[in-house]
Amino acid sequence: MSEITRNAIYDYVASAITAVHTNVRCTSRYIPVLPSYPSCYIHEIEHYRPLENMQLDYEDVQWQSSFEIQVISNKKGTAASEAYSIMETAKAAFNSLYFRELSETSIEGTETFTVIGRFRRTIGGGDSMPKS
């Protein structure tokens, strides 16, 4: 078992998505116009904060980790169902890491359909990633 880091969480969720949806392109970098669809953008929301212990120090204590995932599809007619299907896979991956879903919203554009989900969990100093 390995230590929980933002990269380990990204790798775990991206691998879970691409194992089920082989045509999805996952990235952790924001690209304004993604060259291929369907795509998912997974990133940690930068406003996480460490939680202090009773002695008010921050060593080996808990911290809040929040992630956002954007699933973007442009298939005419099936964009919504495809995006929601990919998001369900992402939810299952985040749930297996004990994240809870904070919100989900969708945006229907003229050319694309986007589903956005946010997830959060408290991570302790001794937590580790599950074996895949």
Regions found by a protein language model. Name each.
Residues 37-46:
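A short, hydrophobic beta-strand-centered structural micro-motif
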Residues 27-35:
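Short acidic low-complexity segments
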Residues 1-25, 47-132:
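Charged, amphipathic alpha-helical segments and their flanking helix caps
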